[in-house]
């Protein structure tokens, strides 16, 4: 289990190197980080990228009502966590419905690993735009850039970007098994009477701490704490992590 935890921390720090747009570096340098940070990691040789685009995995899209090669163009910007003794990665995958980042549709794929370098992937996405309450905010751009943290009782909280090709919005979803998700909508929909609803925002990371060897969501003065960015990085607090 210690090896599993070490591998998981490596994955979080290196962001998995799944984006095929970046090459491997031949220089192996130790990260020099503050005492509070996870450090001392090296990029392994001859294993990257660990998740690459696949042309022949098909998914029936409920919005286009057609079979889509949903991960044929890009696989990148993943989140990694632990579930039932395995590393689970949710990765952003793009189809070929457009040209250029932001002009295709993104969905989230699911992959598992016991060693952090060899992955088994599900053939269909586990999170995607659907005929649901979030369709207007997620279609046609999709669901992007997951960030996952877990509570001490095992509830996984995912911050992700809703992209309707007009405004990127940071949104929240929760799950107990990382496959069946409940969408809660934009994170700031209710803040200050909706003042920030149309403000572009993404890349939300919830503050965590290590408790008895497990990385869990932490409260600060009775509130949840999150960093987010879009042009600028800012700090946010909330008594509830779903709004």
Model-derived features: positions:
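Beta-rich carbohydrate-recognition and catalytic domains
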Residues: 24-77, 81-141, 149-238, 243
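Bacterial Sec-dependent N-terminal signal peptides
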Residues: 1-27
